């Protein structure tokens, strides 16, 4: 059975979801029936075909009136501003992937369902009243049929949660701090211009810019036992893609850096294959562009101080890895209702 999805919002994540679907060979499992985007069809087709970060799309892309053609597939284009007016019932939509970054609470999800969708997956953390928040590879098995409105968390949460779980299971985490070194985003300015956050009034290409982050809250949403035991900060750097996360944790059991690396490498080759990767190559951020993993542990940067303080550096393609997890979570949500096999949904 094929899951019929619609995408609401065809920005960075929405377009990468479509690209990831075609590149990963999952079109027998998922089909895109519609995309709702306020921009015109010509712009949608052009930005799907040509991408500064990820290169030229291998599939033929064209548009005719309000239809987008990807290879031989036809996707209906919509330009609805009001969720209630979306024709999800008419189109037989199983799961809406809301990638606007604007909508994200239970009321918004209910609006999609009232329009005829069976389930909704938000591409950001959303509000605390959602039915579930999923970090694929860690807690997707907790999904139930009654979880209709779900968050896929954030790219940085998907990056760091698997590593935190591995370290906690092995050594017992007492507390931790996280620094997200994040590529620039479209809420920043090309040149100095007004913004409610005065730091984000400054040109993104010229400065390292501290920004607010809810990453610590994202960690405790998945692992409530860490409430008040993690803190996080974030800076934006003048690159257009790929993020590094500096994770420091104090642990109960004494450990050596070599043992930490052995643990993480084994997980990447085993239980977390396809979600976590491990490298000791002398790589830089651009080398992780278009990497489908949620997290890539840089073993050359692992440090242990006093046997109980662990520092790790974890990379992720904050667009491509997250887009692949959107597809994984979509299949996991569908599997609950439609008894699809989502166990092998992660394909590299």
UniProtKB/Swiss-Prot annotation:
GO annotations of cellular component type: cytoplasm
Subunit structure: Homotetramer.
Main EC class the enzyme belongs to: oxidoreductase
Active site per UniProt: 155
InterPro entries assigned to the protein according to its UniProt record, in alphabetical order: E4P_DH_bac, GlycerAld/Erythrose_P_DH, GlycerAld_3-P_DH_AS, GlycerAld_3-P_DH_cat, GlycerAld_3-P_DH_NAD(P)-bd, Glyceraldehyde-3-P_DH_1, NAD(P)-bd_dom_sf
Site annotation Activates thiol group during catalysis: residues: 182
Residues given in the record as NAD(+) binding sites: 12-13, 81, 318
Top-level taxonomy: Bacteria, Pseudomonadati, Pseudomonadota, Gammaproteobacteria, Enterobacterales
Taxonomy, superkingdom: Bacteria
PROSITE patterns in the record: GAPDH
UniProt family annotation: Belongs to the glyceraldehyde-3-phosphate dehydrogenase family. Epd subfamily.
Function: Catalyzes the NAD-dependent conversion of D-erythrose 4-phosphate to 4-phosphoerythronate.
Entry keyword set: Cytoplasm, NAD, Oxidoreductase, Pyridoxine biosynthesis
Coiled coil regions, renumbered to chain: none
EC number: 1.2.1.72
One GO molecular-function entry: NADP binding
Protein name: D-erythrose-4-phosphate dehydrogenase
Location relative to the cell: Cytoplasm
Pathway(s) where this gene product acts: Cofactor biosynthesis; pyridoxine 5'-phosphate biosynthesis; pyridoxine 5'-phosphate from D-erythrose 4-phosphate: step 1/5
